[in-house]
Amino acid sequence: MTVMAPRTLLLLLSGALVLTETWAGSHSMRYFETSVSRPGRGEPRYISVGYVDDTQFVRFDSDAASPRMEPRAPWMEQEGPEYWEEETRKGKADAQTFRVDLQTLLGYYNQSEAGSHTIQWMYGCDLGPDGRLLRGYDQHAYDGKDYIALNEDLRSWTATDVAAQITQRKWEAANEAERTRAYLEGTCVEWLHRYLENGKETLQRAEPPKTHVTHHPVSDHEATLRCWALGFYPAEITVTWQRDGEDQTQDMELVETRPAGDGTFQKWAAVVVLSGEEQRYTCHVQHEGLPEPLTLRWEPPSQPTIPIMGIVAILAILGVVVTGAVVAAVMWRKKSSDKKGGSYSQAARSDSAQGSDVSLTACKV
């Protein structure tokens, strides 16, 4: 269940704050809420999305024809009408709170009402392998910049500027940290356990990565080795390169884990090496779905079984055979023409005019 927003205080965060990476064997629940003002075009647009681990399970959009909190995962269909009515009520209430907050922040930052502004809020909890609270989150942003956040002790706030300090003082006076801590330690943990049980076939599965290494020449003496991990779940994975057993993390290019669009994830890590030294490098992949870590090397393409000189000789022989066949055909044609009383040049001109045998015309030259 989502946490209730304070009615007169600032509530923020969603897409600009990225999902915080969790520990191996742990699980997380996050809500991301965003409100964007649009002067002259009506009320701000408010969107809320909820994630369990890497799976979106609920969504609310104030621009929908009939704004409601809606399921985004099959296992959420188990929740009854009361659940959706309550979550919809909270979504609408938060949308109104954010509308007020946008006006309040204009005053804090001495901004005009002409421009569009964004407030964002992310909150949630991590569970450790033992099922207990590992960490709680409550982070806020304004116009894409950090604004105020609950500290790891869940008892105090960190404000990033003078405007955020105004909010901090209000929240401290209202004991907002205590209210948030009670949610994170209680309700958040309880509902995360429930979702993990209801969606265990999806959320607690482990699909190992499909791995391979590709080779990309950069110059005459350098090449890029890229280690791929595809089709894995959950998203937590480690992909590293080693040279003669020594870690190359500082020298490698690493992309963030990306969704593949089918419920699984992708990742790759690359390193530039000297040509001829490729076999000194190994890629190491660790993932929950693997019985043990993988070690990969680039495998050069297999050499042809027939030597190059042999291929050249075969092609030369074929060339002689083809040439002989063409000459024989020409001689046969010439003899046939002579028997009919016509010359070779006359036959060639006649065939050319009919547009049939081009090869004979070419042989004439």
Swiss-Prot record:
User: What GO molecular functions are on record for this protein?
Assistant: peptide antigen binding; signaling receptor binding
Task: Describe its membrane topology.
Answer: Single-pass type I membrane protein
The cellular location(s) given in this protein's UniProt record come to: Membrane
List of residues that carry Phosphoserine: 343, 345, 350, 352, 356, 359
**Highest taxon of the lineage:** Eukaryota
- According to the record, glycans are attached at 110
Q: Which residues carry this modification: Phosphotyrosine?
A: 344
Q: Which residues form the signal peptide?
A: 1-24
Span list, region Alpha-2: 115-206
Sorted UniProt keywords: Disulfide bond, Glycoprotein, Immunity, Membrane, MHC I, Phosphoprotein, Signal, Transmembrane, Transmembrane helix
Q: How does it assemble?
A: Heterodimer of an alpha chain and a beta chain (beta-2-microglobulin).
Family listed: Belongs to the MHC class I family.
What role does this protein play? Answer: Involved in the presentation of foreign antigens to the immune system.
Please report the name of this protein according to its UniProt entry.
Saoe class I histocompatibility antigen, A alpha chain
Q: Which organism is it from?
A: Saguinus oedipus
